[in-house]
């Protein structure tokens, strides 16, 4: 007998068609995080990023994270992605570029700062964003999301017993 764990080693459901009740016990272990590297107050009516695909509709606080399509953050998520900052869902705005993405953190004004953690996949507080959520937005599967995270993104293993 052999076992082929595949994506289950990351605690992700291999397929929604699997009926084995044990698949419901899988818990995601992969997290994808970044940190805020810049904060900027932007007036109403300003177009952001390449092509100005997003325009502010009010004075806004915009955060930059050093994560883009070169890191595996699919460009087709532009203006459709939400991330977690301080446990609050915040929209990504403008086009995702090769090395950076912009976030509208206006609702966190006065509570957000440089270096704050941003969760792309994972849990923060009581809120979670899953690889399946991103896959649904792109019309694909969770495998494509997690295997698309490029080698530019550092990998850290936590809770591994090295003895």
Per-region residue spans from a language model:
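Active-site anion/phosphate-binding pocket segments in diverse small-molecule metabolic enzymes
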Residues: 1-163
């Amino acid at each position: 007998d052999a076992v082929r764990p595949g994506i289950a080693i990351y605690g992700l459901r291999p397929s929604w068609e699997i009926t084995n009740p044990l698949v419901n016990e899988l818990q995601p272990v992969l997290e994808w995080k970044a940190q805020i590297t810049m904060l900027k107050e932007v007036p109403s009516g300003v177009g952001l990023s390449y092509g100005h695909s997003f325009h502010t509709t009010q004075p806004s606080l915009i955060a930059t994270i050093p994560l883009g399509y070169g890191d595996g953050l699919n460009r087709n998520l532009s203006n459709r992605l939400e991330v977690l900052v301080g446990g609050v869902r915040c929209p990504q705005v403008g086009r995702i570029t090769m090395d950076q993405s912009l976030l509208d953190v206006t609702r966190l004004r006065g509570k957000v700062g440089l270096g704050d953690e941003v969760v792309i996949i994972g849990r923060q507080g009581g809120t979670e964003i899953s690889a399946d959520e991103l896959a649904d937005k792109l019309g694909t599967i969770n495998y494509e999301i997690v295997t698309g995270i490029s080698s530019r993104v550092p990998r850290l293993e936590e809770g591994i017993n090295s003895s």
